[in-house]
Amino acid sequence: MNTYIDIGINLTNKQFNHEHEEIINRALDNGVEQMILTGTSVRGSKESVEIAEDYPGILFSTAGIHPHDAKSFNNESISELRNLLKQDRVVSVGECGLDFDRDFSPRPVQEKCYRVQLELSIEVSKPLFLHERAAFKRFNEITDEYLYRIPKAVVHCFTGTLEEAKIYLDKGFYLGFTGAISDQNRFKHLEEVIRYVPLDRMMIETDAPFMLPKNMPRMQNRRNEPAFLPYVAQTIAHLKKISISEVAGETTEAARNFFGIEF
């Protein structure tokens, strides 16, 4: 069986309440041997770390504040995130960045919150788990101010254009891909992105419970979960005309090296 790492799961989402053990066991049964829980607020990051503590070597976590939650950011948030990031099972700073699509937090507040997390990444020497939506220009202007000091970065759930992908690759960033790559109605443009991006600069993720792959059998429950990660690898293999095992091996190695995860 191929083995995988899911670099982004929202296991604290209420859709997964009281099902953590079942979700994790189904993932393991499908070759998803390690998973990284996404922290999107101070509270959510703490919850993710607590869950990860119960599954050493299998679950890890990020710690950060999503741009939607930037409005809750204050000085206390910085010290709380710093303390979380000192823990070994917390492997990345984020999910952080800018989201100008819905503007759930005021843009100046998003920018300040993002800058603080860029600085935290430099301080604790842990990579960045980045979010950018409808904010490409401003996101890059801010990121470029820190570019030569930040350790490493992955743009999570990438759905941008080929030109945007090239710009991120030129910065040395990695790209995270979800089930969106199998959605030919909304994201057909990602086919050329997948063909272009080198396999050793890709990581795969479910972003569960969101981004359900379109290339899997139709189910009553339309909720995504980490057990479905192989369908993302399957789409990449199809578009690149390579084996699924090659996709699994390369993306797993990339994720382990990037996040410093041992198996």
Where are these regions (language model features)?
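Mid-domain alpha/beta scaffold segments of enzyme catalytic cores
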Residues: M1-F263
